[in-house]
């Protein structure tokens, strides 16, 4: 075909992984002999390996969730894929995926010796809906707990703010959050309106309103967390970058 009539293969609930030039090349796509297109994508702060029919139709999940994957290599003849994936309690490693079954196995263990001596922060994921907030969006949050967390104690809280504003926090091992949590801080990572991977309406909600409703989303998340008995509302900090 001459390409004049392109077909849309995914809805706006899936953000294809496009790379971040010039830091990394875009992820590969594989057009299978049976008409499937295999690609890496992101949805609600999680990475997945998807397949979509080339003639259009619903995308299906092959593998993923609860991770951030930033690379993809495909072997169509073998029916296998290899991705680089990071999990909330584990830095990135290579994982091999069977495209027919979705079964996976880890291929590398570069950080095992380090992680055996350093306990990772535990992540809790939850959502809030800001009372009276514009558009009624659910705001997804990730709270990281210090290793050895004791709910009978009281901990300072650091709010982490991502850039963009169309960036996002993922189910991933983030060094800055791990360092802060290991130092004894609770770390709150919020994806306010304007963040990617939650659909076009959510991402575009900050157009012409930077620092408006998105700021109120962040503050509502802090207000929600400081109600917990183990959070010291008098010791709050903020960390972030870019935006």
Indicate residue ranges for each PLM-predicted region.
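Beta-strand C-termini and the immediately following turn/loop, strongest in propeller blades
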Residues: 1, 28-44, 53, 75, ...
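Multi-bladed beta-propeller domains
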Residues: 1-27, 42, 51-70, 99-124, ...
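Beta-propeller blade termini and top-face loops
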Residues: 8-14, 36, 42-49, 93, ...
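Phosphate-binding glycine-rich loops and adjacent basic patches that engage nucleotide phosphates
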Residues: 11-15, 33-38, 56-59, 179-190, ...
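Intrinsic disorder/low-structure terminal segments
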Residues: 16-19, 38, 62, 136, ...
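Serine-hydrolase catalytic core recognition
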Residues: 70-243
């Amino acid at each position: 075909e001459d390409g004049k009539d392109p077909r849309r293969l995914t809805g706006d609930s899936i953000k294809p992984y496009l790379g971040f030039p010039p830091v990394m090349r875009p992820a590969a796509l594989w057009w299978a002999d049976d008409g499937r297109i295999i690609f890496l994508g992101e949805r609600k702060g999680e990475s997945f390996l998807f397949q979509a029919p080339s003639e259009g139709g619903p995308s299906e999940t092959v593998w993923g969730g609860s991770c951030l994957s930033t690379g993809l290599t495909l072997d169509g003849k073998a029916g296998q894929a290899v991705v680089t994936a990071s999990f909330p309690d584990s830095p990135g490693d290579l994982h091999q995926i069977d495209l027919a079954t979705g079964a996976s196995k880890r291929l590398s263990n570069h950080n095992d010796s380090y992680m055996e001596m350093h306990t990772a922060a535990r992540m809790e994921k939850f959502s809030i809906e800001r009372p009276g907030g514009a558009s009624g969006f659910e705001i997804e949050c990730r709270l990281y707990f210090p290793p050895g967390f004791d709910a009978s104690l009281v901990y300072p809280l650091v709010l982490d703010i991502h850039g963009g504003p169309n960036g996002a926090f993922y189910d991933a091992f983030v060094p800055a959050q791990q360092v802060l949590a290991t130092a004894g801080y609770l770390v709150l990572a919020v994806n306010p309106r304007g963040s990617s991977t939650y659909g076009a309406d959510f991402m575009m909600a900050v157009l012409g309103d930077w620092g408006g409703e998105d700021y109120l989303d962040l503050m509502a998340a802090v207000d929600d967390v400081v109600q917990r008995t183990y959070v010291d509302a008098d010791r709050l900090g903020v960390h972030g970058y870019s935006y």
